[in-house]
Amino acid sequence: MPHVVIEYARALEHEFSIAEVMEVAFAACARSSVMQPADIKVRAMPFDHVRLEGGVTTFVHVTVSLLAGRAPAQKEHLANLIRQDLARNFPVVESISVDIRDMDPVAYKKRLLKPVLEDAH
């Protein structure tokens, strides 16, 4: 945690690498001072079928889920960083949006397996 989920129009895969989009989003989150880089998890999901108004055909929407407790100004700063960096690096994307969400710490549950380290002998 935090989780950064990038939704995008699959047509963008012909314009640039989605891995680059993930790196730009990660870097913006890392320098935001809202979270630690080691905690950031980024994933991307393409959409084949998209209906947008006004002739818009490409989009990137980023949802960042954080445990509750950040100030509104921190969340606004994070959203602006992500949006600005994506717009600067991927100017062909017609619609870029960011949503920062609070996760309920009582309801959020996680299971994490620790890697097994082999005996050095």
Model regions: which residues?
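C-terminal structural segments of small proteins and small subunits
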Residues: 84-109
